[in-house]
Regions:
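C-terminal and inter-domain tail/linker signature
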Residues: 1-149
Length: 149
């Protein structure tokens, strides 16, 4: 895919995220696609799991915003960076909401296949998330995350 084609698909994906439209975000992904949260060591595969994960994220952070600051392109891969902002108003990986607002810098690596996003690997600092959201790392991991190995 060209950089322009990847950007068009990714922009549609980010727009769906910012509308908090889980189905539309999942629709930009390849049927064999995945979403991987590297910090928490979890991976979701296929449209159903991807949509469910986005729905859970948008429930936890109903004002979620993906503020993309830049992107770079390689052969069938896009790397995007920015800041995820939101207020924790619902459970997140089994942890009760804290009502606190977060602003977490991220880097996402997004491979493409057949004109769609094959996946999204999200990298961010887990300690920053826990500190800003008022979460204990142990509680977050007990709720479904696991440290990467």
């Amino acid at each position: 895919m060209t950089a322009a084609e990847m950007k068009q698909v990714h922009d549609a994906h980010v727009a769906a995220e910012n509308r908090r439209d889980a189905a539309a975000a999942a629709a930009t992904c390849h049927p064999e696609g995945f979403i991987e949260n590297v910090a928490l060591g979890v991976r979701f595969e296929g449209h159903a799991q991807i949509a469910a994960q986005y729905a859970a994220l948008f429930h936890a952070f109903p004002d979620a915003e993906m503020m993309q600051e830049g992107e770079a392109f390689g052969t069938d891969v896009l790397v995007a960076w920015g800041v995820f902002r939101g207020t924790m108003r619902g459970p997140f990986f089994g942890v009760a909401p804290t009502g606190r607002r977060i602003a977490i810098p991220f880097v996402n690596v997004v491979p493409f296949r057949d004109g769609l996003m094959l996946g999204e690997r999200a990298y961010f600092d887990l300690a920053t998330l826990c500190a800003q959201a008022g979460l204990a790392l142990e509680d977050l991991l007990a709720g479904g995350g696991s440290l990467p190995r």
